[in-house]
């Protein structure tokens, strides 16, 4: 599926915002931020990885391995925010400060997102390569554009 070209400065701006939103996460090892952007470049939802609403933030729930059972991923939180606010994500793009896992990739596809923009994988993230490769396969086979931006170029473009 071809996507209308967006000037690289917009990718950089939106990825910078995902970093700010990632800072809202209480996850001690990896904060992740996501934003959903309409085709006319309007931010329609944000999300960060965190515990469910009303669920008490305790250290043991945010540590491995417990966090894998309790933490809602940033991308899913952004999609849920769309649902809660009555905003359709169909045809939108999602920007994430970390490449979506395969479960989030499936949710992104099912929600009708047309493109995913994230950072290039860094060496420190290589343990996630298998999951990310599955995500890329889901996007490719489902016709969702997947774009990786080198992290060192974000912030260079104003």
Feature map (PLM): residue ranges:
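Zinc-dependent deaminase catalytic domain
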Residues: 1-158
